[in-house]
């Protein structure tokens, strides 16, 4: 049985210990110790990592998990049973996890006390934490929740833990949450004058250690809300990143940080106006270009053929332009536009032409080395840019004219 020193002092980061067993594992070796400061993966909190040092060497502990009767330390190299070691955890990692977890207790208590929202899920990753509440909260309630939790943290309330011998011993405690299926001893973490909750993880000694609590996101989740939060140094890093981003924007717009939102909105409005003007101008240019294309239509049998290279026309504008280029008489339109890397093409015909555009597109694909398809009156495709494109286009134009003349 391993003595769990982290339950006695959450700020203890090293201890002397003896290796009880060492067995090969899939990714190294699994060690058990007679006592440890390493917290395992449990209670929604990630495990500690660190080092085991001994005369003549050291091994890295990459993780720790709980089994039925022991804590298993995952090490990169073996340490013989009976070896005396000094176990040391990554203090920064542990303190970060304690800040987030104690902050989660505080946020969950405030949500329950103020809005009756029950925490039904908690997850802590290396980048953020999430709390799942069983009812939705609006923007004003979220601000109130964040403010209340920060005010309690600033009061530097004591955080204590106590173990109870049975479920019956918990009667009378103001428990916010009681995890199911717990076996004795049952550990309860209490924040002075606030939260009381069963929990197996190490926590901050006082709420002042949490630092700032910041809600970064809130999304609807199973009829409730999933909150994403940051505490302590994570919140500081987030605030610094956001401040620096706003600072860069302020310099970009040559304005003060407090005016960035207005400057961005002004640019967005100007961009929207410019896009509207561009669309209007583009429509006029397309109409003019379509008129030129219709004027250049050539008779081929009973129909007219409009075939042209229209470089500079965007791919998304090619089909609308082809539709505008249709004449009053039966017409087949073949347009091709090339940029630096790709050739886009479209085949479009009016009713009565008597040809299937999907079939003709296969001939274009073969001639240009492209891919595309369609059926009936419309087909389109694309191909890599290649030498001799103008010659290939001229040959395709002749082929289409020949097909039109042969159509009945």
Model-derived features: positions:
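Conserved nucleotide-binding/hydrolysis modules and their immediate coupling elements
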Residues: 1-83
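A generic structural motif
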Residues: 30-31, 68-77, 129-135, 377-383
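Active/ligand-binding-proximal structured segments within catalytic/core domains
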Residues: 37-52, 80-131, 377
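Divalent metal-coordination and catalytic microenvironments
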Residues: 43, 105-107, 131, 201, ...
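Functional cores that coordinate and move charged inorganic groups
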Residues: 93, 113-224
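Glycine-rich, acidic loop segments that terminate in or are immediately followed by a histidine
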Residues: 198-210, 233, 304-408
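A conserved active-site cap/scaffold subdomain adjacent to cofactor or substrate pockets
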Residues: 204, 208, 216-263
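Hydrophobic helix-and-loop "lid/oligomerization" segment in the mid-to-C-terminal part
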Residues: 248-340, 349
């Amino acid at each position: 049985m391993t003595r769990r020193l982290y339950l006695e002092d959450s700020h203890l980061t090293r201890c002397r210990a003896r290796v009880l067993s060492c067995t090969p594992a899939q990714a190294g070796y699994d060690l058990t110790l007679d006592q440890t400061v390493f917290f395992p993966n449990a209670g929604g909190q990630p495990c500690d990592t660190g080092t085991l040092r001994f005369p003549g060497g050291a091994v890295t502990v990459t993780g720790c998990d709980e089994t039925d009767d022991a804590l298993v330390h995952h090490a990169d190299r073996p340490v013989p049973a009976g070896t005396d070691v000094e176990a040391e955890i990554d203090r920064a990692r542990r303190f970060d996890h304690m800040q987030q977890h104690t902050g989660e207790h505080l946020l969950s208590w405030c949500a329950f006390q103020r809005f009756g929202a029950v925490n039904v899920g908690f997850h802590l990753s290396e980048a953020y934490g999430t709390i799942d509440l069983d009812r939705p909260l609006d923007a004003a309630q979220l601000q109130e929740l964040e403010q209340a939790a920060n005010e309690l943290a600033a009061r530097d309330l004591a955080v204590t833990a106590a173990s109870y011998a049975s479920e019956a011993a918990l009667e009378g405690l103001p428990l916010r949450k009681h995890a199911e299926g717990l076996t004795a001893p049952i550990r309860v973490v209490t924040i002075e004058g606030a939260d009381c909750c069963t929990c197996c993880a190490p926590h901050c000694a006082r709420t002042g250690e949490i630092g700032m609590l910041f809600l970064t996101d809130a999304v609807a989740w199973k009829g409730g809300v999933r909150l994403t939060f940051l505490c302590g140094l994570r919140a500081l890093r987030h605030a610094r990143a956001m401040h620096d981003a706003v600072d860069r924007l302020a310099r970009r717009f040559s304005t003060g940080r407090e005016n960035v939102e207005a400057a961005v909105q002004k640019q967005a409005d100007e961009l929207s106006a410019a896009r509207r003007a561009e669309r209007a101008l583009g429509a006029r240019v397309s109409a003019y270009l379509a008129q030129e294309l219709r004027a250049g239509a050539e008779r081929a049998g009973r129909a007219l053929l409009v075939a042209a290279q229209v470089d500079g026309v965007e791919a998304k504008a090619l089909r609308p332009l082809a539709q505008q280029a249709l004449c009053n008489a039966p017409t087949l339109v073949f347009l091709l536009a090339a940029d630096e890397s790709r050739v886009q093409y479209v085949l479009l015909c009016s009713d009565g032409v008597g040809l299937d555009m999907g079939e003709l597109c296969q001939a274009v694909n073969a001639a240009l080395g492209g891919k595309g398809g369609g059926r009936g009156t419309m087909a389109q495709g694309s191909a890599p840019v290649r030498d001799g494109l103008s010659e290939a286009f001229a040959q395709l134009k002749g082929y289409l004219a020949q097909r039109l003349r042969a159509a009945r």
